[in-house]
Amino acid sequence: MERQAVFFDLGWTLAAPRSGDWMLTQCFAQRFPRWRDDIPAAQMVQAQALANAWLDQQNINTLDRELACLTQAYRMLGDALPALSMTEADAQTIARDRVEHVQENFTLLPGTREALETLRGQGMRLGIISDTWPSVHKQLEVYGILPLLDSLTFSYALGVRKPDERMYRHALAQMGLPGQQCWFVDDLPGNLLGAQALGMRGIQAVAAPGSVEDGRFPAARTPQRMVDIIQGHGDDTDWSRFRVQLTEADLPAMMALQADMAAALPNPRWYFTSSQEEFAGEVAAGRVQGIRVHGELAAFAIAAPGGGEGSYAAILGRDEPHSLDFQDVMVSPAYRRRGIHSHFLALFEQQARAQQLTAMYATVDPDNLPSLRSFEKAGWKRLTVRSAYAGRIRAYYRKAL
């Protein structure tokens, strides 16, 4: 089902605090210019966590209430950090500045407007789903993106926060679309899981300093990368963080993944399945690299030395004993088009170069266009097309090192 709409969170998805911190604004820094010298970072984090936890429990549905609650939050910050010597006037001034001076405190992430305009130009409808307060309307006016938006869903108006399903249902009702026709972009994986439960496809925004990819969702470091993902051009996930060498204990998961992948192929002839015994031999030889995300085997690949009689070079009659055969790559259907195939190609090339090998070889079904594109994008060259694997036709590829 074609997706027709994109919903966005605001904070660290489309917008950011100019100071780098939602609570420690420029006004705060002006009032307490030495706070970084006087207060240990861990102590500040703990104090902010207490104030933010209190804010999360408040019913903030008017600007006056927002101002009052923010003032109390800054009082709590001052009480927890006596080195600040925060006065009542300080708390009130910082809170009022945060509510009223949107331009000075918040900004769109670079490229946000252009990304939204691109999506609108492609016929996408756009909406916001945000845990936020009434001053958000001022922010959107200052950002100048209201004309690009078709729907607005705010936690303060509904009295619930993400990942409560009522947030997503409200947004979908405004759009008049099922979740299966929508994307949702947020920086928090828990919120993406809530949207996914209603059929939306999630993208994790990782623009915030120190953000780490969850792995279960495509990751975007910039608004433009969100557009790229929606257009099917991979994502910014660093798969090396999730890579492991597989062991005998992983064999059942390997077999299950092989079955899932084969069942999802457009043509079953694209892949020649292996037995568990064959996989066991490769695992025992230490040749199987996997991608594990939150305990789930998302993908694995196998590369073996190419010096034997059954090597791809030998099959083609090429005298190239110092080569590497890229034998298998399997990616769960849930993780397709996420750059994992290309990650394994780059990994095995790096290993082959470290061993001073002369070339890498692989075979691909000539009709398997996604795999062909991955190989050719990585600089592999087609040598020939011939029968292999019980009569199945395969294109043989080589990359010189």
Language model regions located:
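Conserved active-site alpha-helix within GNAT-family acetyltransferase domains
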Residues: 192-198, 342, 366-384
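Conserved acyl-donor/pantetheine-binding loop and adjacent beta-alpha core of acyl/acetyltransferases
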Residues: 300-328, 389
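Active-site rim helix/loop that mediates acceptor-substrate recognition in acyltransferases
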Residues: 96-102, 266-293, 302, 308
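Conserved acetyl-CoA-binding loop-helix of GNAT-fold acetyltransferases
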Residues: 164-169, 331, 337-350, 373, ...
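Conserved beta-strand-loop-alpha-helix junction that forms the acyl-donor binding cleft
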Residues: 186-190, 362-372, 389-390
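N-terminal helical cap/lid subdomain that shapes the substrate entry/recognition surface
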Residues: 2-110, 121
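Conserved GNAT acetyl-CoA-binding A-motif
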Residues: 180-183, 352-364
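Asp-based, Mg2+/Mn2+-dependent phosphohydrolase catalytic module
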Residues: 1-6, 88-91, 113, 117, ...
